[in-house]
């Protein structure tokens, strides 16, 4: 007679085994109608799952994050059902959930077009409206193999052969005549899957291996209700307008070429943003007492073997050979910084030693994963490594946290999600060291009044870490900053210091990045500001325009004075109507537009407009310089 304990502490007793849905029905028909799945003793299960003994139970609905995930996964199966009806010869591969949606990889001789997506979505809608029940059947490995052999599903057979033990009992989900294999859980019926949209088609290699066949990947999104779906579509449209690749092209900031995949060609205005950002971070490095260094971009294989990168990260490194020696272009800066620390005897009095570098790194990212500035092969990290004693770790971490928030606040990022990743199963070091390290990071966050959540088991094998994720104006998450403890690398590379007792000790190494990579952070800024950078960061801060040729000499004097005062100023003396020139430079996102006509020239003034269209009226050139100077210095 199972006794079911609900989240509010109430209990319900039953005379015999009951399913999750039975419990929901016992509570009320409204809840049963909303129930998608359940969590029995912490384990997520289907609504049809039987409870045979006393257990705790949480009923999952579309209001729960798990419920939405299940809806999305079931929509992937619904897509599979629709594809099979419209294209009977299609071979189904995998159909997982992703952020905000799902996809399904298919093997089909003909290409899926935009028109085909419309037809598929229509068929999905027709199927969902029937509200058919999703039936879960668990059987032997052979039962599943026979079912997919009969249907000619070669990819499902490969999954069975390569990923599922023959002693396992895989679950098959029956969507009328369509069958799919999955761990689940899934919705009990298609009544829960009505708010979806197919988004696009892309190519994807089977198993992510370029040696395998290229499949077609159909992406979709799914939500709990119509309002959420509509809001997401609106956000997507806004994100499209903010796409840094499009804005970068419009503003002539950078470009890419097939001859250098994942490498950025910076143009003058884009490089201006880059160097201003670097200058800003360099000022912060001086403020927070860092030494700036520059380590080689390429080092001998032997060093990467000692550091462990050759064993753990060889596929991600670009290598070359010269004079029978093998070299790797650095994918990260830490080994080079340890070499700098190792030059000369270090005493406890030298610690903490903070070493920073704008390190140019290269990683052999798969070509299919490259995405504008957000995912590149060549990038610059605002990287730093702090060598310190164990007793200094907590104080140093607090300084890192302070610097992170100082920098993010300068760009208006106030919504920062913080996570603390703790020890993984595969790790080095004693539990005592890990206890100290995790407690130290947690205490540093607490002392800094930073709310955070734990990510159990997500730390690196050599130490725990803090991750800082920026939430942008569209609610998108961008993981940028990290503060990570490392007990392994200093020891592997022979880093030591002499303690107060004249004994040698291995320092603790703190890896610290704030922007993550300059390229990616610039991409984030472009999308956050839609190219309307703060004045201090804008590649062109002001443009002066004449109304007739008569004012040209005066305009040239003004632009010369602006440049002499250190501003990035341009002049537009073209024989065009002033309205046309104003519109053009507004589209270029220039913060201040200066207009000169006869009246301004006679009074020695300028008319000032902002890119938002605000008319600031006439002012003297000196007053404008003072205004601009204050704005740039305060980094508004």
Swiss-Prot record:
- Give GO MF terms, alphabetically: ATP binding; metal ion binding; threonine-tRNA ligase activity; tRNA binding
Annotated catalysed reactions:
tRNA(Thr) + L-threonine + ATP = L-threonyl-tRNA(Thr) + AMP + diphosphate + H(+)
Assigned keywords, A-Z: Aminoacyl-tRNA synthetase, ATP-binding, Cytoplasm, Ligase, Metal-binding, Nucleotide-binding, Protein biosynthesis, RNA-binding, tRNA-binding, Zinc
Q: Where is this region: Catalytic?
A: 243-534
> Where would you say this protein principally sits, based on its record?
cytoplasm
Which prosthetic group or cofactor does it need? Answer: Zn(2+)
**E.C. numbers:** 6.1.1.3
For the ligand (Zn(2+)), the binding residues are: 334, 385, 511
Could you tell me where this protein is found in the cell? Answer: Cytoplasm
Q: Which InterPro entries match?
A: aa-tRNA-synt_IIb, aa-tRNA-synth_II, aa-tRNA-synth_II/BPL/LPL, Anticodon-bd, Anticodon-bd_dom_sf, Beta-grasp_dom_sf, TGS, TGS-like
GO terms for biological process, alphabetical: threonyl-tRNA aminoacylation
Q: Enzyme class, one word? A: ligase
Q: Does the keyword Cytoplasm apply?
A: yes
**Gene3D superfamilies attached to this UniProt entry:** 3.10.20.30, 3.30.54.20, Anticodon-binding domain, Bira Bifunctional Protein, Domain 2, Threonyl-trna Synthetase, Chain A, domain 2
List all disulphide bridges recorded for this chain: none
Q: Which intervals hold domain TGS?
A: 1-61
Signal peptide range: none
Entry GO terms, CC? cytosol
Function summary: Catalyzes the attachment of threonine to tRNA(Thr) in a two-step reaction: L-threonine is first activated by ATP to form Thr-AMP and then transferred to the acceptor end of tRNA(Thr). Also edits incorrectly charged L-seryl-tRNA(Thr).
| Similarity-based family | Belongs to the class-II aminoacyl-tRNA synthetase family.
What do we know about how this protein assembles, alone or with others? Homodimer.
The protein's name in its UniProt record: Threonine--tRNA ligase
Task: Provide the taxonomic classification.
Answer: Bacteria, Pseudomonadati, Pseudomonadota, Gammaproteobacteria, Alteromonadales
